[in-house]
């Protein structure tokens, strides 16, 4: 993929936490998606990513088969497939065969309106990758935020990725950009000795 939220967030976290970066915003120049910025506010880091519009799609039989579902509200496509479901319980209940998704040639996101404080929830499956279900996915929110902003008629939302580990994302749509807020923690520090 040409856009990776994990790497952007991790790089920003290291710059802010370990390199004593004095500003509140970091500007990254990227090869494929142009400039990306990350802004720090307390414990939260906000990524400024391009907004991706999705198109309605006729779901391939394999998509529904590998998700183990027959019912869905709609299927859309951008970089990834997006399968919209009725509610959060349906999203949590999916037990996909992720390896069998490889012939689809795309990653697969499932989403639905959220319960309680959450505007929407999602899960993200990565066929053929080392991590079969991504715990939290910044880049797929480039597609989810414009979709839910239009559906819910609001530009600021709280989302939850309901993977096993899970994570909250503060979401905002501003024109052709999305702002995705998340939290990062340092779990490992080490030294590399160059000889």
Annotate the PLM regions.
Residues 1-195:
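Active-site proximal loop and beta-alpha junction motif in alpha/beta enzyme cores
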């Amino acid at each position: 993929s040409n856009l990776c939220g994990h790497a952007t967030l991790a790089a920003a976290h290291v710059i802010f936490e370990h390199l004593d970066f004095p500003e509140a915003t970091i500007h990254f120049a990227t090869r494929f998606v142009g400039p990306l910025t990350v802004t720090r506010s307390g414990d939260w880091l906000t990524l400024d990513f391009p907004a991706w519009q999705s198109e309605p799609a006729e779901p391939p039989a394999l998509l529904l088969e590998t998700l183990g579902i027959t019912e869905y509200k709609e299927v859309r496509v951008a970089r990834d497939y997006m399968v919209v479901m009725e509610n959060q319980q349906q999203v949590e209940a999916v037990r996909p065969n992720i390896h069998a998704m490889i012939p689809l040639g795309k990653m697969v996101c499932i989403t639905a309106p959220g319960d309680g404080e959450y505007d929407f929830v999602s899960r993200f499956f990565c066929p053929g990758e080392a991590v079969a279900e991504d715990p939290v996915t910044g880049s797929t929110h480039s597609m989810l935020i414009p979709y839910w902003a239009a559906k819910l008629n609001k530009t600021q939302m709280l989302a939850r990725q309901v993977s096993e580990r899970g994570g909250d994302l503060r979401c905002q749509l501003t024109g052709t950009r999305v702002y995705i807020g998340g939290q990062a923690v340092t779990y490992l520090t080490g030294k590399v000795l160059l000889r």
